[in-house]
């Protein structure tokens, strides 16, 4: 007889597009970054790169730039320009929580689950977002790719969250995000719940193709899914 799956004890949440409204900020910052490198908006090359950015939403941004430019110095230059542009957008008031996100995180923690916020951004950008939202203490832990080794779609951040929170079993993990790479990360980490949300980059078909076990309208529905196990 197969043993029942243990109840979820750890929730690993994405930020932009899942708990934080993106509103096209990534694409705006990408446009600013490529402009510094002389890439003309509207050109065929710019369109090709933007398609790749959209397809790989959730991936570590420096990894995206390495793929696009194939040269470390150029990738680092683009990444610095991207971060500067993104920080300007945050400082200009373009950063806001998605409806119900704060309440969902609070409900999950009140229900005894540990919550970890993860991102494909650098630590500097992640902290900028957290500071802008007043979210420094909203979660048990926050992680970026540099904290774990590799970013999405690799399982490193999820497994680092498991280790840092002393969670016993990968089956006690729920991963929630808005991109296919979030789903792949959850699957590769062995999470029992891999929940996609429709508030960000990718549609239900992409989320399910990449391994979603559930697709929710938004993160606001996540406590209802996970906390019913505790009843």
Where are these regions (language model features)?
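Substrate-recognition element of Asp-dependent hydrolases with the DxDx(T/V) motif
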Residues: 30, 101-133, 143
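Conserved Lys-Pro-Asp/Glu-containing loop-to-beta segment of HAD-superfamily phosphomonoesterases
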Residues: 152-183
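Short acidic capping loops at alpha-helix termini that bridge into adjacent secondary structure
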Residues: 45-48, 137-141, 169-173, 193
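Surface-exposed amphipathic alpha-helices with a cationic face
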Residues: 102-110, 162-163, 183-188
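A short, structured active-site edge motif that brings together acidic residues
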Residues: 52-54, 135-151, 172
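Structural recognition of alpha->loop->beta junctions
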Residues: 134-144, 206-224
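Acidic, Mg2+-coordinating phosphoryl-transfer loop and its flanking beta/alpha structural elements
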Residues: 174-214
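N-terminal helical cap/lid subdomain that shapes the substrate entry/recognition surface
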Residues: 4-106
């Amino acid at each position: 007889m197969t043993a029942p799956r243990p109840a979820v004890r750890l929730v690993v949440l994405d930020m932009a597009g899942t708990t934080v409204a993106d509103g096209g900020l990534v694409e705006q910052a990408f446009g600013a970054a490529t402009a510094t490198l002389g890439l003309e908006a509207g050109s065929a090359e710019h369109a090709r790169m933007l398609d790749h950015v959209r397809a790989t939403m959730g991936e570590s941004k420096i990894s995206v730039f390495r793929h696009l430019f194939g040269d470390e110095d150029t990738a680092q230059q683009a990444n610095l320009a991207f971060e500067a542009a993104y920080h300007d957008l945050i400082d200009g008031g373009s950063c806001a929580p998605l409806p119900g996100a704060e309440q969902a995180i609070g409900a999950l923690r009140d229900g005894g689950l540990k919550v970890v916020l993860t991102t494909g951004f650098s630590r500097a950008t992640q902290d900028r977002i957290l500071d802008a939202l007043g979210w420094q203490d909203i979660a048990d832990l926050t992680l970026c790719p540099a904290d774990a080794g590799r970013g999405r779609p690799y399982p490193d951040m999820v497994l680092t969250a498991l280790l840092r929170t002393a969670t016993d079993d990968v089956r006690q993990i729920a991963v929630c995000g808005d991109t296919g790479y979030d789903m792949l990360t959850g699957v590769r980490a062995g999470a029992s719940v891999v929940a996609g949300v429709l508030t960000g980059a990718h549609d239900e078909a992409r989320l399910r193709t990449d391994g979603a076990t559930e697709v929710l309208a938004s993160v606001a529905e996540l406590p209802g899914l996970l906390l019913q196990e505790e009843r």
